[in-house]
Amino acid sequence: MISLSTTYAQGLGEILYDSHEIYYEKTITKRRFGYQTLVNRIEGLKKNNLFEVSIATKSTEGRNIYLIKCGTGKTKVMLWSQMHGDEPTATMALADIFNFLENKKDSSTRKINPILDNLREELLKKCTFYFVPMLNPDGAEAWTRYTNLGIDMNRDALALQTPEGQLLKQLVFDLKPDFGFNLHDKNRRYSAGQSGNLATISFLATAYNQTEDVNPTRKRAMQIIVGMNQAVQLYIPNAVGRWVSDFEPRAFGDNIQKWGTTLILIESGGYKNDPEKQYIRKLNFVSLLTGLQMIASKYYKKKSVKEYEQLPINSKAIYDLIIRNVTIKKGESIFKADLAINRNERPVKGKDYFTNSSEIEEIGDMSVFFGTDEIEAMGMEIIAEKEIGLGSKADFQLVKEGKLIYTIKNGRIE
């Protein structure tokens, strides 16, 4: 058998990356895939004796919240996703991981790397996994961060006012997992440090007290994150960030770390031209299985916490579009300034897609900020049907010496 501890150093992340499409769950192709789509996949797991599927509780609106168990190992690992209903990226990746664990492949004749079979065997032999995908199904259906009660579940670890929050704490106390993965999405405009690099993936070993001390429980999380970061840096160099570690006494991640489970937070952000987050889904698949392998093999013990501390802190340094040094006419005034524009999503009720509405959010000196797209507009002026200003929709033309250079339509360059 190939030693996975050695294999990891030689590129387990590359093998997982190259193999993801084999295990891609084809019933889920968009972020807003809906509760029933996930239920259908979970019900399908019951056909395989590898999985024990049970209804852990019901949501406020009566939807089932499932607990999926697999593996026979001593080390217990619990993973939950979508405690915020509009944060689905990791749920998609978990569906792919279910396919990997049950060795459910696509219909291609593509040869499977034998290292993946060894990985699967090691994970299931050394670990017992507990998955809770879509912990907030009511929020997922309504496409909102909050539960049906209007409560942010990740601020309910103490008050326990939601059935979903009550379940999460009960599972942690009953199962006593050694390791936990708290899986979220974040605003896609966060940057990795004060840079123009979108923080496509961000990690955090959550703090368990106000002074953010590092005990053995939290140190293990930092070490695992180092390996996960190494796996995805190959594909998103300088686009991995570290979430702010300020202690939040009401949050589950902070409390679960305090209760003795090594807790790893993963936040999926933005990646250019990936509105449905299918590429970020792939990176979740790679990073999660890498992290699980490090737990199963205990390879994380070889990692240095210093590498975790070197990850750049997330910053809000990015807009969707920045137009620099453009000439603007407003009333009797003519001046040169930068424009910062964002396109904001709005869910369409009952549908699996979104509409977008652009807005000019800043006018002035944007030299310390970055745009996912940028235009250097020196010598250009804005021509628009209506006078532009803060809050205006970004519909206009950029003209230089009477010649049309760019058309901006709803915040996009055409």
Predicted regions and their residues:
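C-terminal accessory segments enriched in acidic
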Residues: 8-33, 175, 202-414
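Active-site/substrate-binding loop(s) of hydrolase catalytic cores
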Residues: 74-78, 83, 87-238, 257
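Active-site-proximal beta-strand/loop segments in catalytic clefts of secreted hydrolases
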Residues: 56-57, 70, 81, 133-136, ...
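Hydrophobic h-region of N-terminal signal peptides that target proteins for export
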Residues: 1-7
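Conserved beta-strand scaffold positions in the cores of enzyme catalytic domains, especially
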Residues: 53, 67, 131, 180, ...
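Alpha-helical scaffolding within the catalytic cores
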Residues: 62, 115-118, 247-253
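Short beta-strand-to-loop junctions in surface cap/lid or active-site-entrance loops
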Residues: 66-74
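Short glycine- and acidic-rich boundary segments immediately preceding or forming the N-terminal edge
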Residues: 8-65
